[in-house]
């Protein structure tokens, strides 16, 4: 249930500083958000898939930690990122 290579490259080019910037906080949060959105559609059909639900909770927790880190380090980048992603934080 991972993202395709093209989708990942598109997210990296959109949120990264350059085409190879896969490690910045913004890119990591954007990739996690895309994976979370993909899994939410999966759970609409497969309600009893508890194994994948545990992975979803892990991704949500990781995204929350990265957003907290970004908010601590640079509030302007944090607010810009949550507006671009449409998160309700």
Curated annotation (Swiss-Prot):
What keywords tag this UniProt record? Answer: Ribonucleoprotein, Ribosomal protein, RNA-binding, rRNA-binding, Translation regulation
- Any single Gene Ontology cellular-component annotation: cytosol
| Induction annotation | Part of the metY operon that extends to pnp, also has its own promoter.
Report if keyword Amino-acid biosynthesis is assigned.
Answer: no
Q: Which GO terms describe its biological process?
A: cytoplasmic translation; regulation of translation; ribosomal small subunit assembly; translation
- GO MF term set: rRNA binding; small ribosomal subunit rRNA binding; structural constituent of ribosome
Task: Spell out the SUPFAM superfamilies in the cross-references.
Answer: S15/NS1 RNA-binding domain
Ribonucleoprotein listed as a keyword: yes
Query: Known PANTHER family for this protein?
Result: RIBOSOMAL PROTEIN S15, BACTERIAL AND ORGANELLAR (PTHR23321), SMALL RIBOSOMAL SUBUNIT PROTEIN US15M (PTHR23321:SF26)
The job of this chain, per UniProt, is described as: One of the primary rRNA binding proteins, it binds directly to 16S rRNA where it helps nucleate assembly of the platform of the 30S subunit by binding and bridging several RNA helices of the 16S rRNA. Binds to its own mRNA, stabilizing it 5-UTR and preventing its translation.
Quaternary structure (record): Part of the 30S ribosomal subunit. Forms a bridge to the 50S subunit in the 70S ribosome, contacting the 23S rRNA.
In the record, the note on similarity to other proteins reads:
Belongs to the universal ribosomal protein uS15 family.
Q: What name appears for this protein in its UniProt entry?
A: Small ribosomal subunit protein uS15
Ranked from the top, the taxonomy reads: Bacteria, Pseudomonadati, Pseudomonadota, Gammaproteobacteria, Enterobacterales
